[in-house]
């Protein structure tokens, strides 16, 4: 899309909607996507949910729906959220992890986003005008107050920052 004038042809359309930045970024614009479930016989109709989810949950959720047992080594990080997808409850995933283009990790809970420190530059250099979200210091955002990730609260909420850093470390360590 970059050589075919897609950027120019989009005009004022923002592909990442209300979120900051876009694809390749550590910000929400790089990972937040709508998830649409359409199944007239099985899913609640006309409902929307802001429950946190992850595409990594597809194997466990679809296996449950299909009554297929996954082996312990299969889809290790996948969680069954089929009842949330079908609108039968609103239970969100506890957290989701994303990786930006330079391999820096983010940990997203229902209301907060932690972006791990990174030595990458502030903008993508090879293509679109996209903020990377990379900084040499940890970042923490309250997404319930600003989906655009405007105010870094890492210094104001050190205990929450440490808790999310520890959780990301545990997940990376396989715990």
Locate predicted features.
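A general alpha-helix detector
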Residues: 61, 149-152
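Active-site-proximal N-terminal segment of extracellular/periplasmic enzymes that hydrolyze or transfer
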Residues: 151-159
């Amino acid at each position: 899309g970059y050589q075919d004038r897609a950027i120019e042809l989009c005009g004022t359309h923002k592909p990442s909607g209300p979120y900051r930045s876009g694809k390749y970024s550590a910000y929400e614009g790089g990972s937040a996507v709508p998830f649409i479930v359409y199944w007239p016989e099985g899913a609640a109709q006309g409902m929307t949910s802001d429950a946190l989810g992850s595409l990594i949950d597809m194997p466990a959720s679809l296996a449950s729906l299909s009554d297929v047992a996954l082996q312990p080594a299969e889809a290790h990080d996948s969680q069954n959220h089929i009842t949330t997808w079908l609108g039968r409850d609103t239970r969100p995933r506890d957290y989701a992890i994303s990786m930006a283009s330079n391999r820096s990790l983010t940990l997203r809970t229902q209301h907060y986003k932690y972006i791990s420190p990174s030595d990458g530059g502030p903008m993508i250099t090879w293509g679109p005008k996209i903020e990377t979200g990379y900084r040499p210091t940890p970042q923490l955002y309250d997404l319930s107050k600003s989906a655009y990730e405007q105010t870094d609260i890492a210094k104001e909420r050190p205990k929450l920052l440490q808790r999310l850093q520890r959780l990301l470390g545990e997940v990376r360590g396989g715990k």
